[in-house]
Curated annotation (Swiss-Prot):
Domain EngA-type G: 30-193, 203-376
Name of the protein this chain belongs to: GTPase Der
Similarity comment text for this entry: Belongs to the TRAFAC class TrmE-Era-EngA-EngB-Septin-like GTPase superfamily. EngA (Der) GTPase family.
Role: GTPase that plays an essential role in the late steps of ribosome biogenesis.
GO BP field: ribosome biogenesis
Species this chain originates from: Mycobacterium ulcerans (strain Agy99)
Keyword Cell membrane: no
Quaternary assembly: Associates with the 50S ribosomal subunit.
Length: 469
């Protein structure tokens, strides 16, 4: 080591900082809503427009239950595609709730594509939708879907009777006619600037947890409207749904996700695919709010989801929901039980809430802010090495193979999550790395954020790129 306590070959040992800066948000883009009856091919059309599989597609009416927005690009034009649940004017129960979602999409979009199954023809529901859309004053385009051949063009022609102008004959499944439809639609949308804002955009929050734990209810309580379908059916929310919500004087981007099933491999159809998408939502988030049912014992599934969030390296807030269902004389006991069950992650932010009544929901914002501040934290190299020197002097690493490893140099390679690299003369046992993590937290905080400690062993003098252990 040099006199200032750093390894003399520091330039050879340091890792390059990963580029974790968020991509700048695009300028506000016009919204194109895709609406129609259940199972007419809306999500397939959305996927065709995007050129990738995003919307859940399955041959079962009602698979898409929430409004879902995706950024799209066509011939240099940026816009937002909004997928919706099936639109049924007189739907009951869950279908009625989805119909309300579609109605909101009609009101908030800049243009609407009404998708009709050309092989079925215009139904009473299709004609009712057309009348409502015409009254909206928005540009409306009629997509006659499932026209897979020239012979089927006649089916599309019968839809002139709906009064929406020319039916655009398409096959969302095979791509037929979709390009011409988009060219026509984009002529009615305002131009979108290609320049990208220098701002970072709202912090991203994923809501995760078992089915029916209260994710949608919490989102609605925070947003103050029925943004996400809430229904007393486990697994009601199928697609991740982004909502921009102002809380505590700032805007947050919430992603409401489908509950992870007991075992993803055992889920079938759209449930399996939505579970995979939930994993993607965790990866896309910066802070994850894990909802746990306080009225029930902690389950293996809860712990498995928590492990997945930590492995993804996201800031964490544990929200024990349905706290209002816990007897007051049991709450202190339950708090202690939770501390014992989660002893390995005492660093996680925790709040006890009721999404239904709104109890303590306001505590979520400070918890998320604390977790994100820890997640963003960087410790300068000088103070970090001074700290490691003091810790090692008081508690050296255990002897391994007759030799005691020395820590030569420490650096924080990245934030988000804070990741530290220790350059050593030998392998550090897992127990000692956990000890260092505890001491790091005692000194520097990191409340609500996982931290990672990687070790690079200097096998012999002069080795410039030692292997990671």
């Amino acid at each position: 080591m040099t006199q200032d306590g750093t390894w003399s070959d520091e330039s050879d040992w340091e890792l390059d900082d990963a580029d974790l800066a968020d991509l700048a948000e695009a300028a506000p883009a016009p919204v194109l809503a895709i609406v129609g009856r259940p199972n007419v091919g809306k999500s397939t059309l959305v996927n065709r427009i995007l050129g990738r599989r995003e919307a859940v597609v399955q041959d079962i009416p009602g698979v898409t239950r929430d409004r879902v927005s995706y950024d799209a690009l066509w011939n240099g034009r940026r816009f937002v595609v909004q997928d919706t649940g099936g639109w049924e004017p007189d739907a009951k129960g869950l279908q009625q709730l989805v119909a309300e979602q579609a109605s909101v999409a009609m009101r908030t979009a800049d243009a609407v594509v009404l998708v009709v199954d050309a092989t079925v023809g215009a139904t009473t529901a299709d004609e009712a939708a057309a009348r409502i859309l015409l009254r909206s004053g928005k540009p409306v385009f009629l997509a006659a879907n499932k026209v897979d051949s020239d012979k089927a063009e006649a089916d599309a022609a019968t839809l002139w009777s709906m009064g929406l102008g020319e039916p655009h004959a398409i096959s969302a499944m095979h791509g037929r006619g979709v390009a011409n439809l988009l060219d026509t639609v984009l002529k009615k949308l305002p131009e979108v600037a290609e320049s990208v804002s220098a701002g970072g955009g709202p912090r991203r929050v994923a809501l995760v947890g078992k089915p029916n734990v209260g994710k949608s209810s919490l989102l609605n309580k925070l947003a103050g409207d029925e943004r996400s379908v809430v229904h007393d059916v486990a697994g009601t929310t199928v697609d991740p749904v982004d909502s921009l919500i102002e809380l505590g004087g700032k805007v947050w981007r919430f992603v409401d996700t489908a509950g992870l099933r007991r075992k993803v491999g055992q889920a079938s159809g759209h449930e399996f695919y939505a579970s995979v998408r939930t994993r993607g939502a965790i990866d896309a988030a910066e802070v994850v709010v894990l909802l746990i049912d306080a009225s029930q014992p902690l389950t293996e599934q809860d712990l498995r989801v928590l492990s997945m969030v930590i492995e993804a390296g996201r800031a964490v807030v544990l929200a024990y929901n349905k706290w209002d269902l816990v007897d007051e004389d049991r709450r202190d006991l339950l708090d202690r039980e939770i501390d014992r069950e989660l002893v390995q992650i005492r660093w996680a932010q925790r709040v006890n809430i009721s999404a239904k009544t709104g109890r303590a929901v306001q505590k979520l914002v400070p918890a998320m802010e604390t977790a994100l501040a820890s997640w963003d934290t960087r410790i300068p190299t000088g103070p970090l090495n001074s700290w490691i020197k003091e810790v090692v002097a008081a508690t050296p690493p255990p002897v391994r193979g007759g030799k005691q490893p020395r820590i030569l140099f420490a650096t924080q390679a990245t934030a988000r999550p804070p990741t530290f690299v220790l350059f050593t003369t030998g392998f550090l046992e897992a127990g000692y790395r956990r000890f260092l993590e505890r001491r790091l937290r005692e000194t520097f905080g990191f409340e609500g954020s996982p931290i990672r400690i990687n070790v690079r062993v200097r096998e012999k003098r002069g080795a410039k790129r030692p292997g990671r252990r």
